[in-house]
Curated annotation (Swiss-Prot):
L-aspartate binds at residues 131, 135-136. It comes from Ralstonia pickettii (strain 12J). The gene is argG. Its main location: cytoplasm. Keywords: Amino-acid biosynthesis, Arginine biosynthesis, ATP-binding, Cytoplasm, Ligase, Nucleotide-binding. Pathway: Amino-acid biosynthesis; L-arginine biosynthesis; L-arginine from L-ornithine and carbamoyl phosphate: step 2/3. Signal peptide: none annotated. This is Argininosuccinate synthase. Its EC number is 6.3.4.5.
Length: 445
């Protein structure tokens, strides 16, 4: 059964994820002229660079949409962002600086909520602006078909007729002007930007070259902290969690998760917190490069992980991080709602997050420079008296106890010596004149 349509479905309803930009505007009008019945759906994801959401559906109607709807996706996006924090669903990092999978989270919400809205209007064909080289074409495909098994996909950017007529932005602008809309292209930037309430992605064009970097980016969620003329004052902030959910900032309770992220974005953004430069593997295994912003996610992540390390034992933390790496990849691949992802996420939310209650106080400076000033929780297993270097009453263990514990180590030490001897006889290790222990033999064997 054909799922992807390569030609305009004449006379049929076609839902388009409509941003109001040149690409989707030209695509909507072009489909209308070719005989399709375009329905426009716009996701309100709280994009920091979007000034007037209500104007977008009106614009779609002007361009020929049969119907245009604005879908408020912010509450769902905020909750998915918190779920990602709780489960540590992040697999891409460089030098300890994390990418918080904000675009994959946005696609999970957009792909499900827009297709659900289309089903309400009996629209079973969906198009969006993703290209064949990127991740989004697969993410939207998966989420769309999960939500509506009867869904067909029509993307003008996969239709050769559309490409031949409107293959570039100059052609699209000329087409819209000819149609009487006087659409002018916005000034070309040195890179492209995609954003939602959780974070922003800057990529492509000049940023495809690794000798261009963060210094050419104009942040939309924070400040250009690398510029010496940008003043950034140190600031203290406290974040409170209750059973894994953020509930207060600086002592002020915030029940609405959307408002929580907006407040954290404001605070973190004043410092440029959460910006990172990453080289990553796309779903198709080719490498790409992006520069990311996520001030609110970064604040939550730092505070949450501080409580995790103070509350849980080493084995739990290890499993949380291993599962988080795997879950981050699944999220990146468009599998956030697949059973294997739900299993990993639910495990972390139930057995890790539910114990995470407390308050962490930070001092934020420039960029990702911060200090942890205080950690408070009724669930802390950190107890300074257990390992105090001072003499304490009722010590949890004595020198004699430690002697016994060390003596027990002799068992595995004997086994280790025997194994090293076996490897030496096999030629895998050699005894050097300056070494008391066997060394790897330079990879010769």
């Amino acid at each position: 059964m054909e799922t992807i349509l390569q030609h305009v479905p004449v006379g049929q309803k076609v839902g388009i994820a409509f941003s109001g930009g040149l690409d989707t505007s030209a695509a909507l009008r072009w489909m209308k002229n070719k005989g399709a019945l375009p329905y426009a759906y716009t996701a309100n994801l709280g994009q920091p660079d979007e000034e007037d959401y209500d104007a977008i559906p009106r614009k779609a109607m002007e361009y020929g949409a049969e119907k245009a709807r604005l879908i408020d996706c912010r509450p769902q996006l905020a909750n998915e962002g918190i779920a990602a924090i709780q489960s540590g669903a992040f697999h891409i990092s460089t030098g300890g600086i994390t990418y918080f999978n904000t675009t994959p989270l946005g696609r999970a919400v957009t792909g499900t909520m827009l297709v659900a809205a289309m089903k309400e209007d009996d629209v079973n064909i969906w198009g969006d602006g993703s290209t064949f080289k990127g991740n989004d074409i697969e993410r939207f495909y998966r989420y769309g078909l999960l939500t509506n098994p009867a869904l067909k996909i029509y993307k003008p950017w996969l239709d050769q007729a559309f490409i031949d007529e409107l293959g570039g932005r100059a052609e699209m602008s000329a087409f819209m002007t000819k149609e009487g809309f006087g659409y002018k292209m916005s000034a070309e930037k040195a890179y492209s930007t995609d954003s939602n309430m959780l974070g922003a992605t800057h990529e492509a064009k000049d940023l495809e070259h690794l000798n261009s970097g963060i210094r050419i980016v104009n942040p939309i969620m924070g400040v250009a902290f690398w510029k010496p003329e940008v003043e950034v004052k140190a600031e203290e902030v406290s974040i409170t969690f209750d059973e894994g959910r953020p509930v207060a900032v600086n002592g002020r309770e915030i029940a609405d998760p959307v408002e929580m992220f907006l407040e954290l974005n404001r605070i973190g953004g004043r410092h440029g917190l959460g910006m990172s430069d990453q080289i990553e593997n796309r779903i198709i295994e080719a490498k790409s490069r992006g520069i990311y912003e996520a001030p609110g996610m970064a604040l939550l992540h730092i505070a949450y992980e501080r409580l995790v390390t103070g509350i849980h034992n080493e084995d739990t933390i290890e499993q949380y991080r291993i599962n988080g790496l795997r879950l981050g990849r699944l999220l990146y691949q468009g599998r956030w709602f697949d059973p294997q992802a739900i299993m990993l996420r639910e495990t972390a939310q139930r057995w890790v997050a539910r114990a995470v209650t407390g308050t962490v106080t930070l001092e934020l400076r420039r960029g990702n420079d911060y200090s942890i000033l205080n950690t408070e929780s009724p669930n802390l297993t950190y107890a300074p008296e257990r390992l105090s270097m001072e003499k304490v009453e009722d010590a949890p263990f004595s020198p004699a106890d430690r002697i016994g514990q060390l003596t027990m180590r002799n068992l595995d030490l004997m086994d280790t010596r025997d194994k090293l001897a076996i490897y030496s006889k096999a030629g895998l290790l050699s005894l050097g004149t300056a070494n008391a222990l066997p060394q790897l033999d330079g990879g010769k064997k």
